[in-house]
Amino acid sequence: MRFVDEARIQVRAGKGGHGCLSFRREKFVPRGGPDGGNGGDGGSVYLRADNRLLSLYDFRLKRLYEAQNGRPGEGSQCDGRKGENLVLNLPVGTLVYAEGPEGEVLVADLSEPDAEVLVASGGRGGKGNEHFKSSTMRAPRFSQPGEPGEEFNLRLELKILADAGLIGLPNAGKSTFISQVSAARPKIAAYPFTTLTPNLGVMIDEVDPDRRMVIADIPGLIEGAHEGQGLGLRFLKHVERTRFLVHILSIEDVGDEDPWAGFSLVNEELRRFDAELGERRQIEVVNKIDLVSPERLEALKERARADGREVYFISARDDLGLEPLVQELWQVCESTARNEPIVRLEGLTDVEEEEFPEIEVIYTRE
C-alpha cells in the first residue's frame, strides 16, 4: 500500500426524520386524537485512531462519507428509527482540520490509540403532532420536520508518532541502522535517497519484551530542505513529535577541517523548518567506520573529545559499536517526555449543547 500522509474528505451527518402528522382512526372512535410519532435522529460521524493503520491511502480513493438518515415517525405514536453512526478509522497521529470562514481550524488531534472524536452531529428528528397536543389544542394539524445533519470539509494530515527520529544527510546509513536494531526491512542501497517514504521500526528489549521503542526513519535532508529541496521537507513533520533525534552522519561526509559540518548543515535545516525541532535533544552518530583505518578512526574520536562532543562511532552494516548506542537510546527514551499534544476537539459545533431552535411546522388543509 502506498504511503499517503495527507487527504481531503467531506463528512456529512444524517438528516433527522420528519415528525408524523397522524390521527387515531379506529372503529367506534370517531374523534381519535393525534398520534403522530417523532422522527429519528440522524447518524453522526466520528473519527477513531487505529494503531493498525499507517497511511491515509484509502481516503484518497473515496472523498464523501455520509452517516445514515433518521427514519420518519409513524402513526400510533411510533417513533422513527435513529440513523446509524459512521465511524472512520484513521492512523494514530492524524491531525484533522476543518474549513471555516476564516481558514482552516484544527478540530482534532488523534494522538492516542482508540481516541474517538465527534466531527459532525446528526440532525434531530422532528416532533410528531402528538407532541403538540394540549388542553387548548386538541387536534394539532402540523408536525415538525427533521433537522439537517452537519457537514464539513476536512483535511487529514498524518504525523507519525515515534519515540526516536532518524535524521541525517542522504546515504548516511539510517535504513541499515533501523534494520539492525528492529524488524523493519527498508530498501537499502549505496545511493542517495534510497528511502522515499518514512519507515517505522520497533526496537524490543531482549530481556524485557514489553520494553519497546518506535523509531522513525525519514528521507535524508540536504541543504535547502526547508525550502523544498530534496525529499526531506515533506517528511520532517514526521519527527516533530519524537522524544529525541538520532542524527547519523556517514564517515564519508566527515572532513578534516570541520568534521562535524554535516551535523551543522542538517541542524540548520531543522531550525529553519521549526525552531523547537532544532533544539530537540539529539544523539550524534558517525556511521560506516568500517570504511576507514583504525588510525583515522582514533583521530576522529580524539577530535570529538577535544571539541566536547559525545559522538557514537558505529558500523551498522558490520554491527560495530551498536550495543553502547542502543543502551543510550533506551536511557534517553525513558528520561525524555514525548512531544505530543493531547486529543482535543474544538471549532466544530456540538448540536447537543445548543438550544432547540424555534419550531418549524408543516400545516395541512382543513
UniProtKB/Swiss-Prot annotation:
Q: Give the region (Disordered) as residue ranges.
A: 121-148
The EC number(s) given in the record are 3.6.5.-
Where does this protein reside within or beyond the cell?
Cytoplasm
Residue stretches making up the Obg domain:
1-161
Cofactor annotation: Mg(2+)
Binding-site list for GTP? 168-175, 193-197, 217-220, 287-290, 315-317
One Gene Ontology term from the biological process aspect of the record: ribosome biogenesis
Entries under InterPro entries matching the protein: G_OBG, GTP-bd, GTP-bd_Obg/CgtA, GTP1-OBG_CS, GTP1_OBG_dom, GTP1_OBG_dom_sf, OBG_GTPase, P-loop_NTPase
Q: Which cysteines are joined by disulfide bonds?
A: none
Q: Where does Mg(2+) bind?
A: 175, 195
Cite the entry's keywords alphabetically: Cytoplasm, GTP-binding, Hydrolase, Magnesium, Metal-binding, Nucleotide-binding
**Alphabetical list of CDD domains matching this protein:** Obg
Naming one, the record's GO cellular component terms include: cytoplasm
Record domain OBG-type G: where = 162-334
Q: Annotated Gene Ontology MF terms?
A: GTP binding; GTPase activity; magnesium ion binding
Record's subunit section? Monomer.
Give the family per the record.
Belongs to the TRAFAC class OBG-HflX-like GTPase superfamily. OBG GTPase family.
Protein function: An essential GTPase which binds GTP, GDP and possibly (p)ppGpp with moderate affinity, with high nucleotide exchange rates and a fairly low GTP hydrolysis rate. Plays a role in control of the cell cycle, stress response, ribosome biogenesis and in those bacteria that undergo differentiation, in morphogenesis control.
Q: Which HAMAP family match?
A: GTPase_Obg
> What PANTHER family does the annotation carry?
DEVELOPMENTALLY REGULATED GTP-BINDING PROTEIN-RELATED, MITOCHONDRIAL RIBOSOME-ASSOCIATED GTPASE 2
Q: What is this protein called?
A: GTPase Obg
Task: Tell me what organism the protein belongs to.
Answer: Desulfovibrio desulfuricans (strain ATCC 27774 / DSM 6949 / MB)
State the organism's lineage.
Bacteria, Pseudomonadati, Thermodesulfobacteriota, Desulfovibrionia, Desulfovibrionales
